[in-house]
């Protein structure tokens, strides 16, 4: 954290008796996580996406039924948000269950059938991006690398994490040489060594209250776009969530 007063020291009217406020910031590589959007491919559930998430659920000891429900609900939400142009208006549902809304953030996956406990376990390992993305082997955890790579043992995933700390991968062939897995184990549809999507977090803390702003940004070459931004108080003066 940095004191806000350090940025305002040139202000002759600054009052030293004022309470200290602190600024902090963080950038997270979201392509170091499994992307929930990969569960859908066009107008169907993705076989490779389900395989990766199934391995992650198994590693974390989570019920596979929740994954099945989440994928089905995500497909339903996607179809409702982007109905085929040749089918006309969406027809009313006959099962009495309203269409789920299309989530924008990981916290909103509760809408699709995840329990709070499962969401808490998954949150460090997953993201929700507007398009399908490969996993960046330079920033993903061993759990994510193991999940996204068919046939890769957890020990080999941990070996990759250790190797990149000494020398980041510049190509997928670098990872293949270390893992010594089967040919084609690392491919551009599932893996990468660079990223386009990041979350930028900024916080302002005063006493026990923290105001946090989170933004999803997309970088393409020298062009950076903000796709969404959310701001809110994450703790009150009693140290509890608002």
Residue ranges of predicted features:
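Compositionally biased linear targeting/interaction segments
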Residues: 1-242
């Amino acid at each position: 954290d940095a004191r806000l007063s350090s940025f305002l020291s040139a202000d002759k009217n600054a009052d030293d008796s004022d309470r200290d406020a602190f600024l902090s910031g963080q950038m997270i590589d979201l392509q170091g996580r499994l992307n929930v959007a990969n569960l859908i491919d066009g107008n169907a559930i993705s076989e490779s996406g389900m395989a990766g998430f199934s391995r992650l659920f198994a590693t974390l000891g989570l019920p596979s039924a929740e994954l099945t429900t989440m994928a089905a609900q995500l497909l339903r939400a996607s179809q409702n948000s982007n109905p085929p142009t040749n089918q006309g208006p969406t027809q009313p549902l006959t099962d009495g269950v309203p269409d789920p809304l299309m989530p924008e953030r990981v916290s909103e996956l509760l809408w699709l059938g995840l329990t709070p406990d499962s969401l808490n376990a998954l949150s460090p390992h997953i993201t929700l991006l507007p398009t399908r993305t490969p996993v960046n082997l330079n920033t993903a955890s061993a759990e994510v690398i193991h999940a996204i790579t068919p046939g890769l043992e957890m020990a080999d995933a941990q070996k990759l994490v250790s190797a990149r700390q000494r020398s980041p991968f510049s190509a997928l062939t670098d990872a293949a040489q270390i893992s010594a897995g089967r040919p084609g184990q690392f491919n551009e549809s599932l893996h990468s060594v660079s990223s386009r999507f990041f979350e930028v977090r900024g916080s302002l803390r005063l006493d026990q209250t923290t105001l946090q702003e989170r933004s999803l940004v997309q970088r393409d070459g020298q062009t950076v776009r903000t796709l969404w931004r959310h701001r809110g108080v994450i703790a009150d003066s009693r140290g509890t969530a608002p």
